[in-house]
């Protein structure tokens, strides 16, 4: 009887707590007036589940269609789809701190400082980023074009050798190999060998594929259960494979930087002027003053290895997917590229300064990035002490707000009623600052714009016309669509194409 009474009392207490919590979240909570479904307003498990399915971009677009530009996606978090809010949430003058979503991404453990992506405090981020910002500027990236071209030449050579008219290839694989080999050229003084070997022989890339969904699900979860999620994951054989691969990546970054630092210290050596050289230059010239040492360079190298290639791969794949789906745009772009080559305006391996003069090329790249940004996630920020007003609604300090480029990029008020359609001409027909501002969200916005943005854009702009000129791409089955997997990076699969050499 006593046991039964205790169990009954416990159930009543739990039920009473849940009812009280539900009433509070729905009626008294500072975010209770923000529209949205019931479950996100009372538990973060709804968001965790949505993330675990790998389709948060699709879910959020549907939520905003149903509930409007402000939607509550967790008891303490709002997703905003109002283009005007970009300036407020991702301000360059009064930036908001990142939320605890980013804590879990501080992996690598080289420096006493987190990697730039995982730093949540804006003051610390400002101090650390300004140390290396010049290294990643477009003016510096343009000096690195010969190293990017090394990978492009090998890409064309290996694809030409491999291509059989009726043999399909996975474009995503090839673009990922290319992007990682460029990272190798820029950070480690040599290609990582993916294009040369036409594969992931060491399981390097596979380990990242294993880790990304788990880290993303844990990051989106309540801090109270993140440890549990990661703990359960580490018990699996899949986890051991992923962690082994991650340790290999850590050691690759460590060994490569140490080897290069030793070479630079020797007279007559270290003449290769790549990105790693520029970072080591900071260490030798003002490292003590800036508290920036070899371990911080390893942080940069590790960040490049774990996140520096995905955006390039995703966007290159998106561009060619939309082109082979819409042959009319493909043919027009090929005419533009061919004409530029024939009139001497475009080199065989184009420079960035040449390709940005091609209007349809620029429009095509912008349009593909708009429709399928590399990151399909809300980038949450914590409202500061002054609070913030969004669409006439005051959001008090301490709550989380964010925007998803995969939602904002399809805003019909900005891009028109055909916002879900691939139509590059929209970028040529009119000049609109709102269009560019929304599209800039693809690489983040404000003070937290992706530091590798210029590297990615340089690779993309140079590679697209090169491949358009050298090859012809066609979908194996034009009736099929790709499959996307939105675990922070919104990766695609199933883009099988036939490739033929044009012979020009």
From Swiss-Prot:
PANTHER family: CYTOCHROME P450, P450, PUTATIVE (EUROFUNG)-RELATED. Disruption phenotype: Impairs the production of griseofulvin, but accumulates the intermediates griseophenone C, monochlorinated griseophenone G and dichlorinated griseophenone G. Pfam families: p450 (PF00067). Residues 1-16 form the signal peptide. Pathway: Secondary metabolite biosynthesis; terpenoid biosynthesis. Griseofulvin is a spirocyclic fungal natural product used in treatment of fungal dermatophytes. It catalyses: griseophenone B + reduced [NADPH--hemoprotein reductase] + O2 + H(+) = desmethyl-dehydrogriseofulvin + oxidized [NADPH--hemoprotein reductase] + 2 H2O. InterPro entries: Cyt_P450 (IPR001128), Cyt_P450_CS (IPR017972), Cyt_P450_E_grp-I (IPR002401), Cyt_P450_sf (IPR036396), Cytochrome_P450_monoxygenase (IPR050121). Heme binds at residue 450. Glycans are attached at residues 97, 150. GO terms for molecular function: heme binding; iron ion binding; monooxygenase activity; oxidoreductase activity, acting on paired donors, with incorporation or reduction of molecular oxygen. Cytochrome P450 monooxygenase; part of the gene cluster that mediates the biosynthesis of griseofulvin, an important antifungal drug that has been in use for a long time for treating dermatophyte infections. The first step of the pathway is the formation of the heptaketide backbone by gsfA which is initiated by priming with acetyl-CoA, followed by sequential condensations of 6 malonyl-CoA units. The resulting benzophenone can undergo a spontaneous dehydration to form norlichexanthone. The keyword Oxidoreductase applies. This is Cytochrome P450 monooxygenase gsfF. The gene is gsfF. Its EC number is 1.-.-.-. Keywords: Glycoprotein, Heme, Iron, Metal-binding, Monooxygenase, Oxidoreductase, Signal. SUPFAM superfamilies: Cytochrome P450. Belongs to the cytochrome P450 family. GO terms for biological process: griseofulvin biosynthetic process; terpenoid biosynthetic process. Its cofactor is heme. It comes from Penicillium aethiopicum.
